[in-house]
């Protein structure tokens, strides 16, 4: 595994058409919205879940690519396995040894970090990659649709409806939304967790393909549209991330409400790129 030696900042742009990209449980599972601006939101937690699911699917049972935060996982049981390892048992600092065991074996721990002090102590890890909430470029229009099902759940319901057997439901969608997420990759933290260049390439692969293994009628058509990567020539970086992100302009070019990615343009001011920073479009 080759060591990560460069700080990286990136812009990830994706869209949704006729779907709910991230439901808000505090609002009846309606699409998340900034209450003051009307802009749509997708949490970092939602995006990291999709990355985890992609890695789990792509890597299967491969050594070093297990997922710590996954469906039905009992986290303290997984931490106990680290303390049962012979090398951890023999270590003078068992907490640090357990922490490194977890980083070595779980992709999402060395990538996103984890708190592992809920049972036997395996310490805490700050992941090499951090993500912001994704925010829509324009305000979104949330639509609620009534839907019907030509069946009922119980005999009692069937008797009540005299055999009509229909139930009603609701489905919330966004007609169209283009979302922008910003990400940060620390080479310094990567060296502490063991996050490697190979892990980074898998992360890019996940961002390109994760929506294709996460299809659901509820989410409509979600697609990765742009992945713009700024690479510094040093571990600590050569320019502030916000200045780099300002070089990326996403502008609406249609007159009415946008309904497709072609209603926008994405440009990069490469002339304004600071010294010792390169930019690459991976999508």
Tell me the role of every PLM-derived stretch.
Residues 1-283:
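RNA-binding basic/glycine-rich loop and surface signature characteristic of RAMP-family CRISPR effectors
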């Amino acid at each position: 595994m080759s060591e990560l030696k460069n700080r990286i900042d990136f812009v990830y742009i994706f869209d949704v058409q006729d779907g709910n990209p991230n439901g808000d449980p505090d609002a009846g599972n309606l699409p998340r919205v900034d209450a003051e601006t009307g802009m749509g939101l997708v949490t970092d937690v939602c995006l990291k879940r999709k990355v985890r699911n992609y890695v789990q699917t792509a890597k299967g049972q491969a050594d070093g690519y297990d997922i710590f935060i996954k469906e039905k996982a009992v986290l303290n049981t997984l931490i106990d396995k680290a303390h049962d390892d012979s090398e951890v048992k023999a270590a003078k600092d068992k907490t640090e040894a357990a922490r490194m065991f977890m980083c070595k074996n779980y992709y999402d721990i060395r990538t996103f970090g984890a708190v592992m002090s809920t049972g036997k102590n395996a310490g805490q890890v700050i992941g090499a990659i951090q993500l912001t909430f994704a925010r829509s470029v324009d305000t979104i229009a949330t639509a609620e649709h009534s839907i019907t099902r030509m069946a009922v759940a119980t005999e009692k319901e069937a008797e009540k409806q005299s055999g009509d057997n229909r139930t009603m439901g609701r489905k919330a969608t966004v007609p169209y939304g283009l979302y922008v997420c910003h990400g940060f990759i620390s080479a310094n933290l990567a060296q502490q967790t063991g996050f490697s260049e190979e892990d980074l390439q898998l992360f890019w692969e996940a961002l390109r393909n994760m929506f294709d293994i996460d299809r659901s009628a509820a989410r409509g058509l979600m697609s990765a549209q742009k992945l713009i990567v700024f690479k510094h020539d040093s571990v600590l970086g050569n320019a502030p991330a916000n200045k780099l992100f300002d070089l990326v302009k996403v502008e609406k070019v249609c007159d009415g409400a946008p309904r497709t990615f072609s209603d926008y343009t994405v440009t990069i001011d490469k002339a304004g790129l600071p010294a010792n920073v390169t930019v690459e479009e991976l999508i």
